[in-house]
């Protein structure tokens, strides 16, 4: 086991895991890995290069060629600032579609593990606890009902001035859940030893406090 602690937080789309993970990292002074951003970056790059999302081998070969960097809450791809560009619904759907390919997932393993740096790391995604950091000191599966997640996503989009339809978002989330849970490579699941945090009725602050309390217990 590495001496550098990792808190691995997995969960479905729009479960709030990114918000919780980034705040936990901030409270602890740890580094933060948003693994979903990496898949969205591949989605954006593959769109620019005209690569079909069904072409796993070609997508896998694209990953090592990408110049990815995170600076002051901004995300760069080949020196272009793409923080907002990778957060569109269309890129999210594309990322979900290409994430089923083992070639893409294996190509990103090393990059994700490179974020494990002193004094510690909080990583969120779909397979952080089960595949990327199986030796994490704390494994959390953060979830919420599809209805609660769709409503959160709806409010996020409206707040950004992006038009959205709640019924469409709910259907999209249900389809992504089915795809994430049934894929052959690293399906979305509750990892062995993971603590399940149901956030449908929790505030962000309550969820963050729960994870921090679990972490203190884990290292005690």
From Swiss-Prot:
GO BP annotation list: pyrimidine nucleotide metabolic process
| Annotated GO CC locations | cytoplasm
Q: From which domain of life does this come?
A: Bacteria
Query: Which keywords does the record carry?
Result: ATP-binding, Cytoplasm, Kinase, Nucleotide-binding, Transferase
Where in the cell does this protein reside? Cytoplasm
Q: Name one GO molecular function term.
A: ATP binding
* Residues forming coiled coils: none
Gene3D superfamilies hit by this protein: P-loop containing nucleotide triphosphate hydrolases
Q: Where does ATP bind?
A: 11-19
As recorded in UniProt, its EC number(s) are 2.7.4.25
InterPro entries assigned? Cytidylate_kin, Cytidylate_kinase_dom, P-loop_NTPase
The answer to whether keyword Kinase applies is: yes
Q: Which principal EC class is assigned to this enzyme? A: transferase
Catalysed reaction, written as an equation: CMP + ATP = CDP + ADP; dCMP + ATP = dCDP + ADP
NCBIfam families from the xrefs? cmk
Q: Which family does it belong to?
A: Belongs to the cytidylate kinase family. Type 1 subfamily.
The protein's name in its UniProt record: Cytidylate kinase
Which lineage ranks, top first, belong to the organism behind this chain? Bacteria, Pseudomonadati, Pseudomonadota, Betaproteobacteria, Burkholderiales
């Amino acid at each position: 086991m590495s001496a550098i602690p990792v808190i691995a937080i997995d969960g479905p789309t729009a479960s709030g895991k990114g918000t919780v993970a980034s705040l936990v990292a901030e409270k602890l002074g740890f580094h933060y890995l948003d693994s979903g951003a990496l898949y969205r970056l591949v989605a954006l790059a593959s769109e620019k290069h005209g690569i079909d999302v069904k072409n796993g081998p070609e997508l896998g070969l694209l990953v090592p060629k990408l110049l990815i960097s995170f600076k002051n809450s901004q995300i760069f791809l080949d020196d272009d600032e793409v923080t907002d560009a990778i957060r569109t619904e269309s890129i999210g759907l594309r990322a979900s579609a290409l994430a089923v390919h083992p070639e893409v997932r294996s190509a990103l393993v090393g990059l994700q593990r490179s974020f494990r740096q002193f004094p510690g790391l909080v990583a969120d995604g779909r397979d952080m606890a089960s595949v990327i950091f199986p030796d994490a000191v704390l494994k959390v599966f953060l979830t919420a009902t599809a209805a609660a997640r769709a409503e959160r996503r709806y409010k996020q989009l409206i707040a950004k001035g992006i038009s959205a339809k709640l019924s469409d978002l709910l259907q999209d989330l249900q389809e992504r859940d089915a795809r994430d849970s049934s894929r052959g490579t690293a399906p979305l699941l509750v990892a062995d030893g993971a603590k399940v945090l149901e956030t449908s009725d929790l505030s962000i602050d309550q969820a963050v406090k729960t994870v921090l309390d679990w972490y203190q217990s884990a290292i005690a």
